[in-house]
Amino acid sequence: MKHSLQVSLLLAWSMFLLTGCPPNGKTENPPIIEIESLTEDSKKIVSIEADGIGTFRSIQVRVSNISEGTVKVNLPSGLYFINPDKNSQDLITAKGIETITLKKGEEKVVEVPTYCTDVNKDCPGNIKKWNCDYNYDGKLKKAIQFYEKHEEEINAYLIKKDPAFSSEAERLQFFQIIIWLHEDGKDDEIIAMLARDSFGNNESQARSWFYSVIADARELAEIIITQDIDALKDWLKKKMLALLPSDRRIDDMADRAKDNLNSLRDRLR
């Protein structure tokens, strides 16, 4: 019996030397797990839930490491969180969070800006433990990621038109209008929600702001639905040109005509 035990221990130690694994099959320092995109399989490694904080503008996301090693996880934009209160709004994240590092058993909480998905429902309260829909790949996610990809150019136009858009909160509010348009929100419904959440129940101010941005929001919403990059470029050119003073606009058009003429001459030579 003693001889048998010694042989077993010797075999186990030999396996550890050859493979780097202890007898129980677990490494002392498991490799870092990097999660670039969230799938159903990710649930075996990290737990992702959210807590409402009384607004549709942001949510607290709780990320917990349930694996045996260290995890690095990226949270993409467009994560869809389901409100446990069916009478209140679900939320979808407006921004991604890069590289959250978690040791075994560690949990981190990050506040993430969000968009509301249903203008007709109540504003979220403070209910905890919202589930994340890992499989959501709908039009809102695609719209957010298209905007994110071309955010620099779109923001440049918005800020040029109105310096108030230098504020990220103002830009998020503008794109929230686009999200509501994608979900068939009506003008009066949107104005009522803006008045309650953003303008201290002042419907007159909410209405004034809404009508100052709605034309651009409708046009941009149509482009985002089609994901047409060329249409976006043309729209931005037209919008930026319209912001130029009249005399500069004429000069710009003349310069463009001259460039086109010179290009034609070069081709004919």
Where are these regions (language model features)?
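Bacterial N-terminal signal peptides that target proteins for export
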Residues: 1-9
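C-terminal motif of bacterial Sec signal peptides marking the signal peptidase cleavage site
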Residues: 18-20
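Bacterial signal peptide processing site
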Residues: 22-24
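Short, solvent-exposed loop/turn segments enriched in Ser/Thr/Gly
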Residues: 54-61
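Asparagine-centered strand-capping/turn motif at beta-strand->loop junctions
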Residues: 61-75
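Intrinsically disordered, low-complexity Pro/Gly/Ser/Thr-rich segments with frequent PxxP/GP/PP motifs
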Residues: 82-135
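Metal- or metallocofactor-binding catalytic centers and their adjacent structured scaffolds
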Residues: 132-170, 203-204
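Activation targets extended, charge/polar-rich intrinsically disordered C-terminal tails
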Residues: 157-269
